[in-house]
């Protein structure tokens, strides 16, 4: 829309003097004037649409003229804009300029034109953004523009330090610290302990076999599956490993991705509590029954000791180790149940507030 010409063409286009002319405004006289423009109701359009930027201010001032946003008509009264900018500014006050002419005046601190004086403060850079308003707001023949001034403060040591402090990106909080709560950390430890203890108990018990013999007779190989209590212990520990692995995987999803397999926190909490309590009872029953068999193997029944009579010290020791690990698994599962109860209490307290 607009064209930018050199300062030499200012006198030809507007009949104004660039330095020391009659229409030059001194810095003291124009200091009180602000970025305001005269009323355009009495202006007569001349068909020109020119923006002038002086060579003196091009290096220090940045003026952005959007191609599609500047559309204005009208000049000052009189031939070639003979009225002085300061007088025009005093007579006509309007917040919407029709056209802004910026050229070099007598003072380096004042930029003036046909539509009024413009006082530039001591800033490092100034950007003018021109936005065209809808035609309905300006009528059929008059078109106004909306002016926005964006000022950038000069660089100072204190300002640069403050800007550096603001621009330094804050460290992103890791997802592990974001989603992992103290109760979640305890759940991690409990689930991992359940998996490890149950797995070791299964390995020790399944590898337990020994030949049963006496000095006179060889009865063959004695294995764990010959005892129903030991088979029950293995079955319960397998179920515990499967359940604890699912819970551990869900905790990993919650910590890393922030999502859960069960969307509802109420259903998830009550489900965890129910299964924890179920496997706590199963571990207790399996461990006590297997412990009873191990005790009978050591002490014997009706005066007959299985371990000492048939030289099964290794078999009995392995069975005792597996039963002991199963008891530790029960204690960890009981701790998980207690933690689930605590979560339910916290949840109920939050709901009743």
Curated annotation (Swiss-Prot):
Q: Does the keyword Secreted apply?
A: no
What membrane topology does the annotation report for this chain? Multi-pass membrane protein
User: InterPro entries per the record?
Assistant: CASP/CASPL (IPR006459), CASP_dom (IPR006702)
Cell compartment(s), UniProt:
Cell membrane
Ranges that cross the membrane: 185-205, 251-271, 278-298, 321-341
Show which residues sit on the Cytoplasmic side of the membrane. 1-184, 272-277, 342-353
A Pfam family assignment: CASP_dom
GO CC annotation: plasma membrane
Residues annotated as region Disordered? 1-24, 70-100
Q: What is this protein called?
A: CASP-like protein UU7
């Amino acid at each position: 829309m607009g064209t930018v010409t050199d300062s030499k063409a200012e006198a030809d286009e507007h009949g104004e003097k660039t330095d020391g002319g009659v229409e030059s405004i001194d810095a003291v006289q124009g200091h009180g004037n602000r970025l305001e423009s005269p009323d355009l109701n009495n202006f007569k359009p001349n068909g020109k649409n020119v923006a002038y930027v002086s060579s003196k201010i091009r290096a220090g001032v940045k003026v952005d003229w959007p191609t599609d946003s500047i559309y204005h008509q009208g000049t000052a009264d009189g031939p070639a804009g003979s009225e002085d900018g300061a007088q025009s500014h005093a007579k006509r006050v309007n917040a919407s300029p029709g056209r802004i002419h910026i050229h070099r005046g007598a003072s380096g601190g004042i930029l003036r034109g046909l539509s009024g004086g413009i006082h530039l403060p001591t800033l490092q850079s100034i950007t003018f953004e021109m936005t065209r308003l809808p035609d309905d707001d300006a009528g059929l023949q008059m078109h106004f523009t909306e002016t926005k001034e964006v000022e950038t403060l000069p660089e100072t040591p204190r300002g640069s330090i403050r800007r550096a402090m603001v621009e330094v990106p804050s460290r992103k909080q890791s997802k592990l610290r974001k989603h992992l709560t103290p109760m979640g950390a305890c759940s991690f430890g409990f689930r991992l302990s359940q998996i490890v203890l149950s797995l070791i108990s299964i390995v020790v018990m399944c590898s337990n076999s020994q030949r049963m013999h006496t000095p006179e007779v060889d009865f063959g190989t004695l294995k764990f599956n010959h005892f129903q209590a030991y088979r029950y212990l293995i079955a319960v520990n397998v179920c515990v490993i499967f359940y604890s692995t699912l819970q551990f995987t869900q905790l990993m999803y919650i910590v890393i991705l922030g999502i859960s397999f069960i969307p509802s926190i109420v259903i998830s909490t009550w489900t965890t509590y129910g299964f924890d309590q179920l496997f706590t009872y199963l571990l207790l029953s399996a461990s006590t029954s297997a412990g009873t068999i191990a005790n009978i193997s050591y002490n014997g029944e009706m005066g007959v000791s299985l371990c000492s009579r048939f030289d099964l010290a290794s078999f009995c020791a392995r069975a005792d180790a597996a039963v002991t690990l199963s008891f530790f698994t029960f204690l960890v599962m009981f701790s998980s149940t207690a933690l689930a109860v605590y979560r339910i209490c916290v949840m109920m307290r939050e709901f009743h507030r």
